A protein has these predicted regions:
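Low-complexity, Gly/Ser/Thr/Pro-rich intrinsically disordered linker/tail segments
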Residues: 186-261, 273, 286, 290
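Conserved hydrophobic ligand-interaction patch in extracellular adhesion modules
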Residues: 64-131, 201
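Extracellular structured ligand-interaction cores
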Residues: 32, 43, 73, 154, ...
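C-terminal membrane-anchoring or membrane-association module
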Residues: 287-320
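Acidic, glycine-rich loop-and-strand cores that form catalytic or ligand-binding grooves
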Residues: 102-172
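Single-pass alpha-helical membrane anchors
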Residues: 271-297
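Extracellular adhesion/carbohydrate-recognition regions
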Residues: 31-61
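Second-shell loop/turn segments in exported
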Residues: 52-58, 73-74, 187-188
């Protein structure tokens, strides 16, 4: 049971710890939805959150550093800009961006979530977009200067047409005729959060050419990366310099009715892989991801400090 009255009122290390503890305890709410893409002669199936991660019905806000900790706990990876575009292209429900005066308070998090939720039609299923902006993986994050400054990259708030409420935005990285209020920007560091930064992730477990793969490997593979990255292979697959932890829950591929992220979505309408996941695939995924994470931890000399409060945001205008 999530009691939001016990959550710290402002963005802070204490609030980050509160959110993370609930997610690690398996109280997060999300549904995985399959998206299919072809590139370089390969066919990939990837499993994204149909809606942003919720906790007690609230779409949570997170810094890039906190989102990485959440992704680790759930066996997931950040979206790339290309994957964010694919989410929009595969949406079943279209919502307009809903900007407001900049704030990172808990009250604003809840208010914004309620406003977005009220716009979702009752009984809606499939992918709902656009609900906010995403922390994403791009090549520039892995440069020495970006790592030294602990940079994060954000992207999102898709819309169709030439402008939205007077904002021209920028072209998306891969969708003709679609623009984003927030083009790929690296103004913020990995500690920043605000009401617009929601948590939409993609499962590490994916399928390429009919074979189960780890998305972490796909992202760095020169031949396969174009499936998920407009930049080709990335130098890494996690937000840099956030200590990796083994998953505490496992999100397995599938679709169908909304289920907690701690269990595999069960639906006869899901993919063939989803139906297989109920048994051996789910166990394999959990052990596979746990083994990889533990192996990396043995040699991990990364920063392990607490996540400080967010820096000041410059609003919902395009950040560069």
């Amino acid at each position: 049971m999530v009691d939001w009255s016990t959550c710290p009122a402002q963005d802070s290390p204490a609030r980050d710890a509160w959110l993370l503890s609930h997610i690690q305890a398996g109280e997060g709410e999300a549904t995985l939805q399959e998206i299919t893409v072809e590139a370089n002669g390969h066919l990939g199936r990837f499993y994204v959150f149909a809606e942003p991660l919720k906790l007690g019905g609230v779409r949570i806000n997170a810094s890039a550093a906190l989102q990485q900790q959440i992704a680790d706990a759930l066996g997931c990876v950040f979206l790339t800009p290309r994957l964010a575009d694919l989410v929009f292209a595969n949406r079943s429900v279209t919502l307009p961006p809903m900007p407001r005066p900049i704030t990172s308070s808990t009250a604003a998090m809840i208010e914004q979530s309620d406003k977005v939720g009220a716009a979702v039609p009752p009984g809606a299923s499939g992918i709902v977009d656009t609900e906010g902006k995403y922390w994403v993986l791009v090549k520039s994050l892995f440069s020495a200067s970006a790592k030294a400054a602990r940079k994060a990259a954000n992207y999102g708030w898709h819309f169709e047409g030439s402008s939205f409420q007077g904002l021209k935005g920028e072209p998306t990285v891969s969708l003709p005729g679609v623009r984003v209020i927030q083009g790929v920007g690296t103004v913020h560091n990995d500690q920043h959060t605000d009401y617009s930064q929601i948590v939409r992730l993609v499962s590490r477990t994916c399928e390429v050419d009919g074979q189960q793969r780890d998305l972490a490997d796909v992202l760095m593979d020169p031949d396969l990366a174009p499936l998920v990255s407009h930049e080709g292979p990335l130098p890494g697959w996690r937000q840099p310099d956030v200590t990796e932890a083994p998953p505490t829950t496992t999100v397995t591929p599938g679709g169908g009715e909304e289920t907690p992220t701690t269990t595999a979505p069960a639906s006869s309408g899901g993919s063939s892989l989803a139906r297989k996941a109920a048994g051996g695939v789910a166990l394999f995924s959990a052990l596979f991801l746990l083994g990889r994470a533990l192996a990396r931890l043995l040699g991990d000399l990364c920063w392990t400090g607490a996540i400080p409060a967010s820096v000041v945001n410059d609003g919902y205008k395009t950040n560069k």
